[in-house]
């Protein structure tokens, strides 16, 4: 098959522009590594994980794939600093943030060579993510699962 090249494949170093959602309770290392091994971008859903559980999932994902994968991290959690420390220590290269202000952690993550993508529910929040230095955004509609915005039209 011919290589598929676009901004998404180039940004993440993946074969296909397919990004698996970082779903709380569902996106563990098995799913993320399978998606990454298939040429997409697997994402660990860290929202339901304590930092030590996240570390275990990252290590198992690394053992199961040599392809890029990321972590989805809701920013509203109380132990966010511990999660971020784990991500940095485990040398995760891609982080999707959501449910919070990306300006709080984006610069810190980028200082460690991490590509940062923020999930937004409106153009207003996309502009804020851009101003915070995020590398990309995911536009999420009201119909989306998880933490979504108050915009009822998408």
Model-derived features: where do they sit?
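Active-site entrance/lid segments in N-terminal catalytic domains of soluble metabolic enzymes
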Residues: 1-154
